[in-house]
A protein has these predicted regions:
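Alpha-helical metal-binding/catalytic segments enriched in His/Glu/Asp
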Residues: 1-12, 68-74, 79-102, 124-129, ...
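Acidic/histidine-rich catalytic neighborhood of metal-dependent amide-processing enzymes
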Residues: 1-61, 106-107, 184-187, 191, ...
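A residue-level signal for beta-strand positions that form part of recognition/binding surfaces
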Residues: 2, 31, 51, 67-69, ...
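Residues that cap or initiate secondary-structure elements
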Residues: 11, 38, 60-62, 76, ...
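Flexible loop/turn segments at secondary-structure boundaries
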Residues: 12-15, 40-42, 78, 113-117, ...
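Generic alpha-helical propensity signal that fires on short helical segments
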Residues: 21-25, 49-52, 88-90, 96, ...
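Phosphate/diphosphate-binding glycine-rich loops and adjacent basic-rich segments that engage nucleotide
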Residues: 29-78, 83, 87, 165-171, ...
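Metal-dependent amide/peptide-bond hydrolase catalytic core
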Residues: 92-208
């Protein structure tokens, strides 16, 4: 039978090329995927991905308290498709957990730059009326159950400046801590194969 070759672009940022592909002229019924990244290897496969954007509308109010810049950096990171099952921490999830339960109000929070990359760093500007906030954050961060892969993780807390804070901070942190992340299901047919996974890849605080 005739051999048809299909080339697409922008796979890493959302399979944009495949989504725009006109398949009406293709006759083949068997797909050989040569995107295995190893020369001489062909893969018969069926996979897909989807990007979900969660938006929390926020109201900005005047700052009450002292502003701090807090974050976590130095995580291993990796490709969320290839390395999601290697026990690597997601910086966005780690920072949200470190802030949960503290007397704090968010001014901004951001981490990650690509949908398919496990975030290595995440940072927030927060406001707290607690005089010992730096110590409270350090104590909460010390409780973070980081996997053994994160030997170089570093938490930090330093004075900052801020003009406004987010009235919905508690809801934002609750959402970040509740969002599932990582491996959700493994294949029942192929040992060690991830069937479904999630990655909280990009976190931003945008202007209205």
């Amino acid at each position: 039978p005739p051999l048809e070759a299909v080339f697409t672009v922008d796979e890493d940022i959302g399979m944009l090329g495949a989504a725009a592909l006109d398949m009406s002229g293709l006759q083949g019924r068997v797909l050989l995927n040569i995107d295995s990244e190893d020369e001489g290897i062909l893969t018969v496969s069926c996979a897909g991905g989807a990007t979900s954007c969660l938006t929390v509308p926020v109201k900005r109010v005047p700052v009450q308290g002292n502003a701090w810049r807090v974050g976590v950096r130095g995580l291993t990171g990796g490709h969320s498709g290839v390395e999601i099952n290697k026990g690597r921490a997601n910086a966005n999830k780690v920072l949200a957990a470190a802030l949960q339960g503290l007397p704090v109000t968010l001014c901004s929070i951001a981490g990650g730059s690509k949908d398919n990359a496990i975030p290595r760093a995440s940072e927030a500007v927060v406001v707290s009326e607690a005089d010992d906030f730096a110590a409270l954050f350090a104590a909460n961060a010390a409780k973070a159950a980081l996997p053994e892969t994160e030997q170089h993780a570093e938490f930090y807390c330093e004075p900052a400046e801020a003009g406004e804070m987010l009235a919905e901070s508690e809801a934002v942190l609750d959402l970040l801590n509740a969002v599932p992340n990582g491996v959700q299901a493994m294949s029942s047919d192929i040992p060690g194969l991830v069937q479904t996974s999630l990655n909280l890849g990009i976190l931003t605080t945008d202007a209205d």
